[in-house]
Amino acid sequence: MSTITTGQIAKLLWPGLNARWGTKYNEYAMEWKDLVDVETSDKAYEEDQEMTGFGLAPIKAHGASIVYDTASQGITSRYTHLAYALGFIITHEAIQDNLYEKIGMQRTGSLAFSMRQTKENVVANMYNRAFNSSYLGADGAVLLSTAHPSLSGNQSNTLAVAADLSEASLEDMCILIGKMTNSRGMKISVQPRSLIVPIDLEFEAARILKSTSQSGTANNDINALRSMGMFPDGIKVNHYLTDTDAFFIRTNVDDGLKLFQREAASFAQDEDFDTSNIKYKAYERYSTGWSDWRGLAGSPGA
Protein backbone atom coordinates (compact mmCIF):
# COMPACT_ATOMS: atom_id res chain seq x y z
CA MET A 1 0.00 0.00 0.00
CA SER A 2 1.60 3.27 -1.13
CA THR A 3 1.59 6.25 1.23
CA ILE A 4 2.53 9.83 0.39
CA THR A 5 5.13 10.99 2.93
CA THR A 6 7.18 14.16 3.39
CA GLY A 7 10.00 12.48 1.47
CA GLN A 8 7.86 12.29 -1.67
CA ILE A 9 6.90 15.97 -1.56
CA ALA A 10 10.13 17.41 -0.17
CA LYS A 11 10.04 20.48 -2.44
CA LEU A 12 6.63 21.42 -1.06
CA LEU A 13 8.07 21.72 2.45
CA TRP A 14 10.26 24.70 1.63
CA PRO A 15 9.33 28.24 0.53
CA GLY A 16 10.35 29.76 -2.80
CA LEU A 17 8.78 27.49 -5.43
CA ASN A 18 7.67 29.47 -8.49
CA ALA A 19 5.26 26.86 -9.84
CA ARG A 20 4.07 23.31 -9.42
CA TRP A 21 3.05 21.59 -12.63
CA GLY A 22 2.05 18.19 -13.99
CA THR A 23 -1.35 17.66 -12.35
CA LYS A 24 -3.47 20.52 -13.70
CA TYR A 25 -4.25 20.49 -17.40
CA ASN A 26 -7.31 21.39 -19.43
CA GLU A 27 -9.59 18.44 -20.13
CA TYR A 28 -11.58 17.45 -23.17
CA ALA A 29 -15.34 17.50 -22.83
CA MET A 30 -16.92 14.20 -21.78
CA GLU A 31 -16.55 12.40 -25.10
CA TRP A 32 -17.91 9.08 -23.85
CA LYS A 33 -21.43 10.51 -23.96
CA ASP A 34 -21.21 10.62 -27.78
CA LEU A 35 -20.58 6.87 -27.89
CA VAL A 36 -23.41 5.40 -25.81
CA ASP A 37 -26.92 5.96 -24.54
CA VAL A 38 -27.01 6.43 -20.77
CA GLU A 39 -29.52 4.70 -18.50
CA THR A 40 -29.69 4.27 -14.73
CA SER A 41 -30.00 1.07 -12.74
CA ASP A 42 -30.94 0.06 -9.20
CA LYS A 43 -30.07 -3.64 -9.51
CA ALA A 44 -26.93 -5.79 -9.62
CA TYR A 45 -27.36 -6.19 -13.38
CA GLU A 46 -29.70 -5.26 -16.22
CA GLU A 47 -30.97 -7.41 -19.07
CA ASP A 48 -32.31 -6.48 -22.51
CA GLN A 49 -34.38 -9.08 -24.34
CA GLU A 50 -34.78 -9.29 -28.12
CA MET A 51 -38.21 -10.25 -29.47
CA THR A 52 -38.34 -11.44 -33.07
CA GLY A 53 -41.78 -10.35 -34.32
CA PHE A 54 -43.55 -11.84 -37.36
CA GLY A 55 -42.70 -12.44 -41.00
CA LEU A 56 -44.54 -11.47 -44.19
CA ALA A 57 -48.19 -12.47 -44.65
CA PRO A 58 -48.74 -15.21 -47.28
CA ILE A 59 -51.63 -15.32 -49.74
CA LYS A 60 -54.69 -17.04 -48.28
CA ALA A 61 -56.47 -19.28 -50.77
CA HIS A 62 -60.30 -19.51 -50.83
CA GLY A 63 -61.50 -21.67 -47.97
CA ALA A 64 -57.98 -22.30 -46.68
CA SER A 65 -56.96 -21.81 -43.09
CA ILE A 66 -54.94 -18.80 -42.03
CA VAL A 67 -51.22 -19.41 -41.53
CA TYR A 68 -50.28 -18.67 -37.95
CA ASP A 69 -46.84 -17.27 -37.22
CA THR A 70 -45.07 -17.16 -33.89
CA ALA A 71 -42.96 -14.58 -32.12
CA SER A 72 -40.10 -15.78 -29.99
CA GLN A 73 -37.32 -14.60 -27.77
CA GLY A 74 -34.05 -13.77 -29.42
CA ILE A 75 -30.78 -12.93 -27.70
CA THR A 76 -30.53 -11.72 -24.11
CA SER A 77 -27.96 -9.03 -23.34
CA ARG A 78 -26.85 -8.78 -19.72
CA TYR A 79 -25.13 -5.73 -18.25
CA THR A 80 -23.30 -6.63 -15.03
CA HIS A 81 -22.20 -3.54 -13.16
CA LEU A 82 -18.52 -3.23 -12.23
CA ALA A 83 -17.02 -1.10 -9.48
CA TYR A 84 -14.15 1.25 -10.28
CA ALA A 85 -12.28 2.68 -7.31
CA LEU A 86 -8.99 4.40 -6.53
CA GLY A 87 -7.50 6.06 -3.49
CA PHE A 88 -4.39 7.47 -1.85
CA ILE A 89 -2.96 7.89 1.64
CA ILE A 90 -1.09 10.90 3.03
CA THR A 91 0.74 11.02 6.32
CA HIS A 92 -0.27 13.57 8.92
CA GLU A 93 3.17 15.16 8.69
CA ALA A 94 3.00 15.57 4.90
CA ILE A 95 -0.29 17.43 5.23
CA GLN A 96 0.86 19.69 8.05
CA ASP A 97 4.27 20.58 6.60
CA ASN A 98 3.15 21.32 3.02
CA LEU A 99 3.51 25.09 2.49
CA TYR A 100 1.40 25.40 -0.64
CA GLU A 101 -2.07 24.30 -1.72
CA LYS A 102 -3.63 21.83 0.66
CA ILE A 103 -2.15 18.61 -0.67
CA GLY A 104 -5.30 16.60 0.05
CA MET A 105 -7.41 18.93 -2.07
CA GLN A 106 -4.86 18.90 -4.89
CA ARG A 107 -4.64 15.12 -4.97
CA THR A 108 -8.43 14.81 -4.75
CA GLY A 109 -8.63 16.77 -8.01
CA SER A 110 -6.19 14.29 -9.53
CA LEU A 111 -8.33 11.44 -8.23
CA ALA A 112 -11.43 12.87 -9.91
CA PHE A 113 -9.46 13.24 -13.14
CA SER A 114 -8.43 9.57 -12.95
CA MET A 115 -12.05 8.49 -12.51
CA ARG A 116 -13.17 10.54 -15.52
CA GLN A 117 -10.35 9.17 -17.66
CA THR A 118 -11.25 5.64 -16.58
CA LYS A 119 -14.82 6.02 -17.81
CA GLU A 120 -13.62 7.50 -21.12
CA ASN A 121 -11.37 4.47 -21.68
CA VAL A 122 -13.96 1.91 -20.56
CA VAL A 123 -16.56 3.25 -23.00
CA ALA A 124 -14.12 3.79 -25.88
CA ASN A 125 -12.84 0.23 -25.50
CA MET A 126 -16.15 -1.08 -26.86
CA TYR A 127 -15.16 0.62 -30.11
CA ASN A 128 -11.47 -0.28 -29.81
CA ARG A 129 -12.45 -3.95 -29.45
CA ALA A 130 -15.28 -3.89 -31.99
CA PHE A 131 -13.40 -6.25 -34.33
CA ASN A 132 -11.63 -8.28 -31.63
CA SER A 133 -12.83 -11.88 -31.42
CA SER A 134 -11.95 -11.98 -27.71
CA TYR A 135 -14.89 -9.64 -27.03
CA LEU A 136 -18.21 -11.04 -28.22
CA GLY A 137 -21.78 -9.83 -27.85
CA ALA A 138 -24.81 -11.81 -26.72
CA ASP A 139 -25.27 -13.15 -30.27
CA GLY A 140 -21.78 -14.70 -30.24
CA ALA A 141 -20.36 -12.23 -32.76
CA VAL A 142 -18.05 -9.24 -32.40
CA LEU A 143 -19.73 -5.84 -32.27
CA LEU A 144 -18.92 -5.08 -35.92
CA SER A 145 -19.35 -8.25 -37.94
CA THR A 146 -20.50 -9.57 -41.30
CA ALA A 147 -22.09 -12.55 -39.55
CA HIS A 148 -24.60 -11.45 -36.92
CA PRO A 149 -26.98 -14.43 -36.70
CA SER A 150 -30.72 -13.87 -37.14
CA LEU A 151 -33.82 -15.85 -38.09
CA SER A 152 -33.42 -14.61 -41.66
CA GLY A 153 -29.72 -15.49 -41.92
CA ASN A 154 -26.50 -13.70 -41.12
CA GLN A 155 -26.59 -9.90 -41.17
CA SER A 156 -23.82 -7.32 -41.30
CA ASN A 157 -22.91 -3.93 -39.85
CA THR A 158 -19.50 -3.66 -41.48
CA LEU A 159 -18.28 -3.65 -45.07
CA ALA A 160 -17.51 -6.99 -46.69
CA VAL A 161 -14.12 -5.56 -47.68
CA ALA A 162 -12.58 -3.29 -45.05
CA ALA A 163 -11.91 0.23 -46.33
CA ASP A 164 -10.26 3.43 -45.15
CA LEU A 165 -12.32 6.54 -44.50
CA SER A 166 -13.33 8.15 -47.79
CA GLU A 167 -16.37 9.56 -49.52
CA ALA A 168 -16.90 6.23 -51.28
CA SER A 169 -16.57 4.12 -48.12
CA LEU A 170 -18.99 6.38 -46.23
CA GLU A 171 -21.52 6.11 -49.05
CA ASP A 172 -21.12 2.32 -49.06
CA MET A 173 -21.61 2.29 -45.30
CA CYS A 174 -24.75 4.42 -45.58
CA ILE A 175 -26.13 2.01 -48.19
CA LEU A 176 -25.32 -0.93 -45.90
CA ILE A 177 -27.16 0.80 -43.04
CA GLY A 178 -30.14 1.57 -45.29
CA LYS A 179 -30.47 -2.12 -46.19
CA MET A 180 -30.57 -3.38 -42.60
CA THR A 181 -33.52 -5.57 -41.64
CA ASN A 182 -34.91 -6.94 -38.40
CA SER A 183 -34.37 -10.52 -37.31
CA ARG A 184 -37.21 -11.72 -39.58
CA GLY A 185 -35.78 -9.94 -42.60
CA MET A 186 -38.32 -7.10 -42.61
CA LYS A 187 -37.17 -3.69 -43.85
CA ILE A 188 -36.60 -1.15 -41.09
CA SER A 189 -35.67 2.53 -41.22
CA VAL A 190 -32.11 2.64 -39.93
CA GLN A 191 -30.42 6.00 -40.50
CA PRO A 192 -26.90 7.29 -39.80
CA ARG A 193 -26.68 9.88 -37.02
CA SER A 194 -23.02 10.68 -36.38
CA LEU A 195 -19.57 9.85 -37.71
CA ILE A 196 -17.11 8.89 -34.97
CA VAL A 197 -13.40 9.10 -35.73
CA PRO A 198 -10.07 9.16 -33.87
CA ILE A 199 -8.09 12.39 -33.78
CA ASP A 200 -5.99 11.03 -36.67
CA LEU A 201 -8.98 11.24 -39.04
CA GLU A 202 -10.45 14.54 -37.84
CA PHE A 203 -9.29 16.60 -40.81
CA GLU A 204 -10.12 13.96 -43.42
CA ALA A 205 -13.61 13.60 -41.96
CA ALA A 206 -14.12 17.36 -42.11
CA ARG A 207 -13.02 17.53 -45.75
CA ILE A 208 -15.37 14.71 -46.72
CA LEU A 209 -18.49 15.91 -44.91
CA LYS A 210 -18.12 19.68 -44.97
CA SER A 211 -16.93 20.36 -48.52
CA THR A 212 -19.59 21.93 -50.72
CA SER A 213 -18.53 19.95 -53.78
CA GLN A 214 -17.36 16.36 -54.09
CA SER A 215 -14.27 15.88 -51.94
CA GLY A 216 -10.84 15.35 -53.48
CA THR A 217 -11.82 15.71 -57.15
CA ALA A 218 -11.94 18.39 -59.83
CA ASN A 219 -15.53 17.47 -60.57
CA ASN A 220 -18.28 19.99 -60.02
CA ASP A 221 -20.54 17.33 -58.50
CA ILE A 222 -22.30 18.10 -55.25
CA ASN A 223 -21.19 16.58 -51.97
CA ALA A 224 -24.06 14.11 -51.69
CA LEU A 225 -23.32 13.22 -48.07
CA ARG A 226 -23.55 16.86 -47.06
CA SER A 227 -26.45 17.91 -49.28
CA MET A 228 -28.55 14.94 -48.17
CA GLY A 229 -27.81 15.59 -44.49
CA MET A 230 -26.65 12.03 -43.96
CA PHE A 231 -25.01 12.78 -40.60
CA PRO A 232 -27.35 15.14 -38.73
CA ASP A 233 -25.36 14.85 -35.48
CA GLY A 234 -22.10 15.66 -37.26
CA ILE A 235 -18.56 14.47 -36.65
CA LYS A 236 -17.56 13.24 -33.19
CA VAL A 237 -13.81 13.16 -32.60
CA ASN A 238 -12.81 10.79 -29.82
CA HIS A 239 -9.33 10.99 -28.32
CA TYR A 240 -9.55 7.57 -26.69
CA LEU A 241 -9.89 5.54 -29.89
CA THR A 242 -6.67 3.60 -30.47
CA ASP A 243 -6.98 2.48 -34.11
CA THR A 244 -5.78 5.38 -36.25
CA ASP A 245 -7.76 4.40 -39.38
CA ALA A 246 -10.93 2.86 -37.96
CA PHE A 247 -14.16 4.85 -38.20
CA PHE A 248 -17.67 4.31 -36.89
CA ILE A 249 -21.24 5.44 -37.58
CA ARG A 250 -23.87 5.59 -34.84
CA THR A 251 -27.41 5.07 -36.07
CA ASN A 252 -30.89 5.95 -34.86
CA VAL A 253 -31.56 2.42 -33.59
CA ASP A 254 -32.68 2.25 -29.96
CA ASP A 255 -31.05 -0.12 -27.48
CA GLY A 256 -27.70 -0.09 -29.22
CA LEU A 257 -24.58 0.76 -27.21
CA LYS A 258 -25.35 1.57 -23.58
CA LEU A 259 -23.91 2.63 -20.26
CA PHE A 260 -25.91 1.79 -17.15
CA GLN A 261 -25.01 4.07 -14.24
CA ARG A 262 -25.47 2.11 -11.01
CA GLU A 263 -23.68 4.45 -8.60
CA ALA A 264 -22.37 7.90 -9.48
CA ALA A 265 -18.79 8.83 -8.64
CA SER A 266 -18.40 9.58 -4.94
CA PHE A 267 -15.45 10.76 -2.88
CA ALA A 268 -14.69 10.22 0.79
CA GLN A 269 -11.89 10.60 3.31
CA ASP A 270 -11.10 9.21 6.72
CA GLU A 271 -8.33 9.35 9.30
CA ASP A 272 -6.59 6.28 10.64
CA PHE A 273 -6.64 6.47 14.46
CA ASP A 274 -3.30 4.73 15.03
CA THR A 275 -1.16 6.49 12.39
CA SER A 276 -3.09 9.75 11.84
CA ASN A 277 -2.71 9.09 8.12
CA ILE A 278 -5.52 10.44 5.95
CA LYS A 279 -7.10 8.15 3.37
CA TYR A 280 -8.91 9.51 0.33
CA LYS A 281 -10.95 7.37 -2.05
CA ALA A 282 -13.15 7.57 -5.13
CA TYR A 283 -15.76 5.00 -6.12
CA GLU A 284 -18.12 4.54 -9.07
CA ARG A 285 -20.13 1.63 -10.45
CA TYR A 286 -21.49 1.17 -13.95
CA SER A 287 -21.67 -1.27 -16.86
CA THR A 288 -21.25 -0.96 -20.61
CA GLY A 289 -22.22 -3.08 -23.57
CA TRP A 290 -24.64 -3.34 -26.46
CA SER A 291 -27.97 -5.00 -27.13
CA ASP A 292 -28.90 -4.28 -30.77
CA TRP A 293 -25.78 -4.26 -32.96
CA ARG A 294 -27.69 -2.20 -35.54
CA GLY A 295 -26.93 0.82 -33.37
CA LEU A 296 -23.42 0.95 -34.84
CA ALA A 297 -21.65 0.38 -38.14
CA GLY A 298 -17.97 0.77 -38.89
CA SER A 299 -14.79 -0.24 -40.62
CA PRO A 300 -11.34 -1.08 -39.19
CA GLY A 301 -9.67 0.65 -42.12
CA ALA A 302 -7.95 -1.08 -45.02
Residue ranges and their predicted role:
Residues 74, 90, 268:
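Residue-level signal for pocket-adjacent positions within structured domains
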Residues 23-84:
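Assembly/oligomerization interface modules of large self-assembling protein complexes
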Residues 129-149:
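Charge-rich, acidic-biased intrinsically disordered regions
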Residues 18, 22-28, 118-126, 169-177, ...:
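Charged, low-complexity, helix-prone segments enriched in Lys/Glu/Asp/Gln
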Residues 1-28:
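N-terminal alpha-helical "arm" segments
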Residues 21, 25, 29, 33, ...:
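Residue-level signal for secondary-structure boundary elements
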Residues 2-11, 143-182, 187-194, 200-302:
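Sequence/fold signature of self-assembling virion shell proteins
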Residues 77-134, 195, 280-282:
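Long, contiguous amphipathic alpha-helices that act as assembly "spine/axial" helices in icosahedral shell
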